[in-house]
Regions:
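Short hydrophobic beta-strand element within catalytic cores of glycosyltransferases
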Residues: 292, 311-320
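Conserved donor-binding/catalytic core segment of Leloir-type glycosyltransferases
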Residues: 209-226, 232-236, 245
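Membrane-proximal helix-turn-helix segments that form the acceptor-binding/catalytic region
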Residues: 107-115, 119, 143-167, 264
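Conserved acidic donor-binding segment of nucleotide-sugar-dependent glycosyltransferases
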Residues: 331-340, 347-354
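Donor nucleotide-sugar binding/catalytic pocket of nucleotide-sugar-dependent glycosyltransferases
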Residues: 147-199
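A short, well-ordered alpha-helix in the C-terminal region of glycosyltransferases
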Residues: 355-369, 381
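Nucleotide-activated donor-binding/catalytic signature segment of Leloir-type glycosyltransferases, i.e.
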Residues: 257-284
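A short helix/loop element that forms part of the nucleotide-sugar donor recognition site in Leloir-type
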Residues: 195-209, 262
Length: 403
């Protein structure tokens, strides 16, 4: 049996709406899928108010051993060393463990794991092309340092992770070039049964949506980097043939200090329907009601959780060319990101059922081989490869001879 300790945020059982990012939900699904295939998984997670220090959920042991902040990752690494598992898998986003103050802790945390005889694997949920870091990038991502400083810091961080980990995982094909030697494992999918057309219409009506219009959906945290303004401007141009739904709350990192989401509602409240945060039991209905998911990301630096959800639910996707390169989407799923061009594409889908069917077919084809079970199998193969590569030569020889 493979024994793995993950360092990552993990959903609390009582406050799921307060997740700091999609990484917590990702960790839960991956851990459960690994456990279902016989892997012993322990998660070292941040403390969450009202949650026990230690719990066991669906076969996964969760220990809440550290607080977010400057000491988050070094403290987590110490707990992971004590766990006994040979592999420690860190799920990493730049500000995930407590904002900018937590970033310097990456190096000592990974070094501590290496000196303790552990095999650190790191999944980079965000990968930035240093050449993309300019004034516009820092403004969009609310990074409060000059572009030169941000560029050096982000590129240095990515090199550091590569050097101190035994293997690095990324979610998108285009990120493999930016992190040489990395392993691409796409986001896993929860694959749902197709929703019959009449059932989808009934769901539309129950949500107060028009059945005689194309329902376009933008889903997930409202963040400046997603190009939501472009979708809103396109909907304004497209007119009555398109009904745009913006489903998602303010990003937790921005909610308390940035008016971005409120500004969108104020500027475009008469163009689209803003429904706010969608509780987990209601997510499937919104994807079933949507005729198309819009992902006009201008410069993606991470794979898209809503993209994976759409593939799982069978909801057709229109995405930017840059996101298509990242996730390996075919040309059929690419749409212009300029508002007039996107509006034209939406009107085409609204007026031509054959084009919408072709988009649905392309989306369904891309979903094959991307279930959480597939993602777990790819991780298990990676863990086995890492363990074998770092096993003493004499033991490797004996194992192969005995096989």
């Amino acid at each position: 049996m493979i024994d793995v300790t993950m360092v990552a945020p993990y959903p609390g059982q009582h406050r799921r709406a307060k997740l700091p990012s999609g990484v917590a939900a990702y960790t839960e699904r991956l851990s459960t899928a690994l456990t279902n295939q016989g892997v012993a998984v322990k998660v070292i997670a941040p403390e969450v108010e009202g949650e026990p220090k230690r719990s066991r959920v669906d076969g996964v042991t969760v220990e809440r051993s550290f607080r977010r902040g400057a000491r988050a990752l070094p403290t987590a690494a110490g707990a992971a060393r004590r766990s006994g598992a040979p592999i420690v898998h860190l799920q990493f986003e730049t500000f995930l463990y407590g904002g900018p103050s937590s970033v310097p802790g990456v190096a000592p945390a990974l070094a501590n794991l290496r000196t303790g005889g552990k095999l650190p694997v790191v999944t980079l949920h965000q990968v930035v092309d240093p050449s993309d870091v300019d004034k516009e990038f820092t403004q969009v991502h609310r990074v409060r340092v000059p572009p030169t400083v941000a560029r050096l810091g982000l590129s240095g961080l990515q090199r550091l992770v590569r050097r101190l980990s035994v293997s690095t995982v990324v979610h998108g094909q285009s990120f493999e070039v930016l992190v040489p030697g990395s392993v691409v494992v796409p986001l896993g999918l929860d694959v749902a049964d197709p929703v019959p057309l009449e059932t989808a219409r009934e769901i539309k009506r129950s949500l107060g949506l028009r059945t005689d219009r194309l329902t376009a959906l933008c889903f997930g945290f409202l963040s400046p980097y997603k190009g939501i303004e472009r979708a809103l401007e396109a909907a304004a141009i497209a007119g009555d043939s398109v009904e745009l739904v913006i489903a998602g709350g303010s990003h937790p990192r921005l909610a308390s200090r940035d008016p971005y989401a409120d500004d969108l509602r104020r500027r475009f409240g008469d163009v689209a329907r803003f429904v706010g945060y969608v509780p987990e039991p209601e997510v499937a209905d919104w994807f079933a009601a949507a005729d198309v998911l819009l992902l006009p990301y201008p410069r993606p630096f991470a794979s898209s959780g809503p993209f994976a959800q759409a593939l799982g639910f069978g909801t057709p996707v229109l995405c930017s060319e840059s996101l298509a390169r990242c996730v390996g989407a075919p040309e059929a799923m690419v749409a212009p990101t300029d508002p007039p061009g996107l509006a034209r594409r939406l009107r085409q889908l609204a007026s031509d059922p054959e084009q919408l069917l072709a988009l649905t077919t392309a989306t369904q084809a891309l979903a094959r081989g991307r279930s959480w079970e597939d993602a777990a199998r790819r991780h298990i193969a990676l863990y086995e490869e890492v363990i074998d590569a770092h096993r003493p030569v004499s033991r490797r020889v004996r194992t192969r001879e005995s096989g």
